[in-house]
Amino acid sequence: MVLRLLLSEARRIRRCGRPRGRLPDRFFFVGLASLVWFLLRTGAKPSRIAYPCQRAALANASLWLALYVLPLAGVLRPGRRTLALLLAALALVGSLALLGLQRRAPAEGLQLEIRGRAASQQPSSSIFVVTGARGRYEDVRALIELMGEHGLKFYRSSRVSPVSGPDGLIARDDVVIIKVNSQWNERGGTNTDLVKALIMAILEHPDGFVGEIVIADNGQAQYGSYGRGGSLSWDRNNAEDITQSMEKVAQQFAAQGYKVSTYLWDEITLKRVREYSEGDLEDGYVVYERPDPYTGVIVSYPKFRTKYGTYVSFKLGVWDPRTGAYNSSRLKVINVPVLKTHAIYGVTACVKHYMGVVSDRLTNHNPHNSVGRGGMGTVMAETRYPVLNIVDAIWINPHPRGGPATPYSEAVRVNVIAASTDPVALDYWAAKYILMQAASRLGYRDLSSMDPDNTQAGSFGYWLRLSAEALRRAGYFVAVDESRMSVYVRPSG
């Protein structure tokens, strides 16, 4: 059938002759370049076809084959004619297959079955889940209260309450980095409503918050929705009001006198610097000299001056140029990834999210290549471990290997947020009970790419365990065994 359609199109092109104007001449080179680029960039990893740039290149290449290769079928000898037809058919089938890969969810979203459970072995990690969440303040407040009910206080304060105490997470004068996903627009980035609600909660510190909040990420100045990396000022965002960017959120609070700002580390990702203690006050990336012996990752991390003049080393803490000393305890990271499948690594959530901390380009793409060897676990351990991880699963991408790009048309609303101090346990649980459940509801049968119990080499479950090993070597307790996970669930409101 496809071959008959292609033959019909070839005859039509020959009848019509060459179109007027210079567009066909230009498109000959554009289409040919797209085909070459597609083959080089996709290489031996077909999963990369899910990336937006690959999809666009494949569409151009398909049209090029139909316009310039298929018409030759009528004048070539039988053997070469068959080859031309096969090439064109293959390209068209590939394009049609991409269009049919995604299964649509109901407009109202999916109602997942989320259950609590108690760990049967100790030590264990706690996971806190709020259902019916849409990124509102009451959703984050419900999460903080649920955490407090089970011993994890959000606010560090001498005032003891259900949500605060001396062992709480966030002190009144902390510098808090909210690490978001900025590389993709639409539903591929962290929900800006959720980030706004989280900032509101931080500012409600019982002792009065006098610290600073920085919304930050490194989209690597490459790939992403437009091939240029990340943005904190997208015009199409993951929010109820899609014009609400991370930058707009920060500006809303700054206009009220709060020290809230953004920093897109893409802007410094190509600049190698030394630490403040070595006399270098420039913004940029500190890069390790040697790769990690276990995971092979070359660790790097940002150091930068915030909008309000605070010097921050992601690894060493807040730098005081007057005393020449770092205050590590004042710097807190809250890791807020959006939950998605990933074309190469199966799932992207808390651990994979630290790809937005390192500089991929200063190290010849070493960090991204190391993810499958547990490299992001090493980065977490070597730089700064998040005090809290919050998975944004309000809108998700559950299509197997469909992410990380997530257009509005492919996102699925499930209205869940979940938090834990253990990024590995949270990734395991979110993949198994949110992504896999949603994918199954949509009719997908092969869920192996997102299954945390799949430990075949190269799989998500495999590299998640390697990441866990890297964190354990550094002294962190993380769980990848469900018997060591307690899950607490409550509805929002």
Predicted ranges, named:
Residues 1-19:
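Short, Lys/Arg-rich, polar N-terminal cytosolic tail immediately upstream
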Residues 35-72:
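Membrane-embedded alpha-helical segments of integral membrane proteins
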Residues 97-493:
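N-terminal and secondary-structure boundary signal
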Residues 70-82:
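Transmembrane alpha-helical segments in integral membrane proteins
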Residues 27-30, 66, 84-90:
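Small-residue packing motifs within transmembrane alpha-helices
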Residues 16-23, 55-58, 430:
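Membrane-interfacial loop-to-transmembrane-helix junctions in polytopic alpha-helical membrane proteins
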Residues 24-36:
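Alpha-helical transmembrane segments
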Residues 79-103:
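Internal/C-terminal transmembrane anchor helices
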